[in-house]
Amino acid sequence: MRNAFADALFEEIQKNKKIILLAGDIGNRLFDKIKKKFPKNFYNCGVAESNMTSVAAGLAKSKFKPVTYTITSFNTLKTIEQIKLDICYPNLPVIIVGVGSGLGYSNLGTTHHSLEDIGILSNIPNLNIVSPADKLETKILLKQVLKKKIPVYLRLGKKGEQDVYEKKCNSKFGKINQIKKGNKICIIGYGNVLRNAIDAYNEIKNIYKPSIYNVHTLIPLFCCHKYFLATLSILLDLKYF
């Protein structure tokens, strides 16, 4: 995923010079094309993730489109206060990219594990959370969120993930994407473990005919809005509150 992210970001910087990439002492070779062709669009902020996050907020206030990038555990939990106060409360258009999410960097020890990032960040107002399933969806969703004027947490795997989408990906920000259509069982997943759901589908498809849904955008989930309002209306009628 990280290579796909770097390629897609390079393409987008060619179109929009307001995009600024801030890296936390990682991805030096990964972003060689950006550094060589657009040296003013890349800054290595070093092992100072909290400062990098505040710098991104300042750039956003100055009409730039900042993207912060480093290992997920460092770009989320170590920077939680800056994400909340500097980016999300003012609702600034910063994209926070975490790479090697989950156990992507498991061999480097518990400091590099990120199993609780979604649970924690989902409680911060204004923060949108997107978790692509493979390299193609990473490119598609990155291009979409770069056009939006909102804070976004883009949760990536590391590398070598199996493809979910081989040639075409029609994922749209905020909307569930149906991958397989069935009629008895519904399998829901997201991120780089979605491939496991497809493997499970292949094992039971001749018996149960399951559907598979990719919830790549965890927040917001537009398809749930009308059902939330309907439920709220019923509760109000029942004087539940």
Where are these regions (language model features)?
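Thiamine diphosphate
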Residues: M1-R155, G160, ...
